[in-house]
From Swiss-Prot:
Pfam families linked: Ras
Entry comment describing in which tissues the protein is expressed: Detected in oocyte border cells (BC), with increased expression at the front of the BC cluster.
Residues the entry annotates as binding GTP: 10-17, 57-61, 115-118
Subunit note: Interacts with Cyfip. Interacts (via REM 1 repeats) with Pkn (via N-terminus). When GTP-bound, interacts with Pak.
Cellular component GO terms held in the UniProt record: cell projection; cytoplasm; cytoplasmic vesicle; cytoskeleton; cytosol; plasma membrane; rhabdomere; ruffle
Designated name of the protein: Ras-related protein Rac1
Membrane-protein topology: Lipid-anchor
PROSITE patterns: RHO (PS51420)
Cellular compartments annotated: Cell membrane
Species annotation: Drosophila melanogaster (Fruit fly)
InterPro entries, per the entry: P-loop_NTPase (IPR027417), Small_GTP-bd (IPR005225), Small_GTPase (IPR001806), Small_GTPase_Rho (IPR003578)
Lipidated residue numbers (S-geranylgeranyl cysteine): C189
Predominant cellular place of this UniProt entry's protein: membrane
Motif annotated as Effector region, chain positions: 32-40
Gene behind this protein: Rac1
Amino acid sequence: MQAIKCVVVGDGAVGKTCLLISYTTNAFPGEYIPTVFDNYSANVMVDAKPINLGLWDTAGQEDYDRLRPLSYPQTDVFLICFSLVNPASFENVRAKWYPEVRHHCPSTPIILVGTKLDLRDDKNTIEKLRDKKLAPITYPQGLAMAKEIGAVKYLECSALTQKGLKTVFDEAIRSVLCPVLQPKSKRKCALL
């Protein structure tokens, strides 16, 4: 069985842990718990191939900036996550997460993931953002960011409703099984 290592990065509280727990257990967790490193492993079938998907959670908080890259070696695919209802987390894709991932892993495929899709149309959430003169991130904005950072895909999902959730991980696996660019290199992340 082929093993694939998928590392999930992004700002604190964008929903990385919920994404993983909801996907691996089919249940949405309750309270917000900051993460250091939780690893999940799931055996899945994608395109009739059995895959052992190793899912690595990371902490987005700045306190972990020096620890986090320790989980990057041998990564096959990165999910860079931001919350669709947190414009600052979206900006940090460009300002922090893309540069960090590319510094350590120059050619590992990236999938850009907009989380909390269920809240984009939530009246209370929209009002709170409007009070700060902000708005939820739109699909075209996400697509443009994915293009800018050279992500292989842009996907949106909700860990709460599970809409688009399975697709995120299926596409992560496909990006490794059917690489779009540089098929000759092994595309593994190395620590120099």
